[in-house]
Structures are given as C-alpha cells and as structure tokens.
Curated annotation (Swiss-Prot):
GTP binds at residues 45-52, 72-76, 92-95, 159-162, 193-195. The gene is engB. This is Probable GTP-binding protein EngB. GO terms for cellular component: cytosol. It comes from Bradyrhizobium diazoefficiens (strain JCM 10833 / BCRC 13528 / IAM 13628 / NBRC 14792 / USDA 110). Mg(2+) binds at S52, T74.
Amino acid sequence: MTDDKDAKLIEAGRKLFARDWQFIWASPSIQTLPPMDGVEIAFAGRSNVGKSSLINALTGRNALARTSHTPGRTQELIFFEVPGKKDLRLVDMPGYGYAKAPKSQVASWTELIHKFLLGRASLARVYVLIDARHGLKDVDLEILGTLDRSAVSYQIVLTKADQVKPSELASRIAETEAALAKHPAAFPNVLATSSRSATGMAELRAAMAKLLEERSS
C-alpha cells in the first residue's frame, strides 16, 4: 500500500468515526437481534479487556459504550450505528472468560457469543481484543476456533499497549502473530492499541474504512 493510499484511508477512517455514533439496540439472545442491515463489525475479548473503552476511543465518545472495572458487566450484544446511515454497525460483545456473575448467566452469554459469530450473515469482521500485558489464553483460542469455523475474517488487536514496555510489546506482537499462523481466517498482522493514549486508533479506523470501501465497490 502506498503512502498516498495510507493517508487517504486514515482520513476516510477519521471521517467515518467523526460521525454521530449512537446506541441503537441491545440483544440478550439470538432471538432479539436487530435486522441485518449493512456491514457489521464486532469486538470480542475476555472480560475487562477494554472493548467498551476501545469503542469509545474510536468514536471519540467517552460515554457511548458503558465501561466498568467489574469483569462481565456487558452481558448483551450492544449495537451502535449512525442514525440515518445503514452502511456500518459496531457490535460490543459480552466478555468471555472470568466474570463476576452466576455461572449459569456466564454460560448463557458465552453461548450467545458463539451463536452470533457462527450465524450472522451481515458480520464482516471481528476484532478479537487481547490484553497486551497477558497475551493469548486458552479461552481466546476457543473463540479463534469458532471464528475459523464461521469463515468470518478476524484480526487480533492488543489493548492497553501503553502499559507494557516497548520491548515487551514487540515480543507480544511476535508471539501472537506466530500463533495466528495456525488460524487461516485470521489476519496475519496484529494491531497494538491504547484507548488511553490513542495509540493505533487511526490505523484501526483506517482498516474499517478500507473494509467498508471494499464492501461497497
């Protein structure tokens, strides 16, 4: 990709996420999902990995997605879009893995996650968020396996990159990319981000603008 093309995508991403993003729907079950309009991009990850914070940073809206220090606070599929626009919809998924909730409830929304990933025709990409301090865990690999079966393209995004040393971050990226070699549906490169410092946000916005451009052409 040329520098000129990069710059155009960065600007397209900036404009895309400068729009008036709003909450539109919350689905506690597959039966309550909204109609499949346009392109959907979902954000998955372990509980408390920073999905809601990332969505807020992308959109520049500090309170768009509810954030919490309590693992497992997001227990539904939360949908966001720009009113009057049907081109792109963002999905904040329940966190998987450890959560401060009854086991039956955790099992219910874990099932919801897997069913959504396997059966949503409008789902164009999933960003799987991994805490840069901890790397891939077994529960993450389970989700990657589900995504491999679903044939939905996905990419790993490291969160909280500002909380690790540059050398540690480089090692984390390298080991994660090596693990992805076993997953054919995964993008081979890993994005490092920080919601706090905005590291990687322009690149992530540009990647989504590129996807939207490809889908509309």
